[in-house]
């Protein structure tokens, strides 16, 4: 996969040079290319923003250098183009799974000042990560890349890790423990040390359902639930009413 990122602050992306993203890049599973669209400004000062038509506070990023930068990317017409902006729908795991199927993504980092509305004519979709304000879309772009890389074949050392992570099955992940067996007054649940794989599976599934029911009940509407799951949820619901 190729991911091109249009930004005014390429230095912010140093975080992608570590951990799983770096390993995926080293294995040529993903190629990330940064483009500073300031270099495509026609002004001597390389200014990329200007006053807003109609007046108002703040400056607006011009569409001209953005589109020029976009068109400089080989294969941009066939690539799936994304703008990060609070006007878009909230980014979720389902969207990450969808984007992971593209061979070429282009992400345009929005800016708190706003971008000329005409940029929407040059992108395929807009995404947001929440109802709050960031200085720019750089952090959003990094989050998108990180979430996608985890879904690419061979990017994770253990593919089972992917299927059991929170949200992948529309459930929060079950609680996990490691050594020591006892820390202060807190012990690892006995069932996890029993060696009984079926009991461990049932325990983990029950705890995932319980955690989701209590913390993120909205996810249950989209989860794939078995008859066993529904019985457990009924039990959890009755216990919550006591």
Predicted regions and their residues:
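Glycine-rich, flexible N-terminal cofactor/catalytic loop recognition
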Residues: 1-39
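Short, structured active-site "lid" loops
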Residues: 48-69
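S-adenosyl-L-methionine/SAH cofactor-binding core of RNA-modifying enzymes
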Residues: 62-109, 116, 153
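Structured adenosyl-cofactor binding patch, chiefly the S-adenosyl-L-methionine
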Residues: 115, 119-165
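Internal, active-site/partner-interface "lid" segment
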Residues: 139, 151-191
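An accessory alpha-helical subdomain
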Residues: 190-201, 207, 211, 220-228
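Conserved small/polar residues in nucleotide/adenosyl-binding loops
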Residues: 239-242
């Amino acid at each position: 996969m190729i991911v091109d990122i249009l930004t005014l602050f390429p230095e912010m992306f140093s975080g992608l040079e570590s951990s799983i993203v770096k390993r995926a890049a080293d294995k040529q599973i993903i190629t990330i290319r940064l483009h500073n669209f300031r270099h495509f400004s026609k002004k001597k000062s390389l200014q990329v923003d200007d006053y807003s038509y109609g007046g108002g506070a703040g400056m607006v990023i011009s569409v001209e250098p953005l589109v020029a930068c976009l068109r400089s990317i080989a294969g941009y017409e066939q690539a799936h183009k994304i703008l990060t902006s609070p006007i878009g729908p909230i980014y979720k795991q389902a969207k990450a799974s969808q984007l992971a199927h593209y061979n070429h993504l282009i992400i345009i980092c929005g800016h708190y000042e706003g971008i000329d509305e005409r940029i929407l004519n040059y992108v395929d979709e807009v995404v947001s990560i929440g109802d709050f304000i960031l200085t720019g879309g750089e952090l959003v772009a990094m989050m998108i890349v990180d979430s996608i890389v985890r879904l690419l074949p061979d990017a994770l050392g253990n593919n089972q890790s992917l299927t059991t992570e929170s949200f992948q099955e529309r459930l929060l992940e079950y609680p996990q423990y490691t050594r020591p067996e006892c820390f202060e007054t807190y012990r690892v649940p006995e069932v996890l040390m029993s060696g009984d794989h079926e009991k461990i599976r049932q325990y983990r599934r029950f705890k995932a359902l319980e955690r989701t029911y209590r913390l993120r009940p909205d996810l249950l509407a989209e989860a794939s639930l078995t008859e066993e799951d529904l019985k457990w949820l009924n039990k959890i619901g009755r216990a919550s009413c006591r």
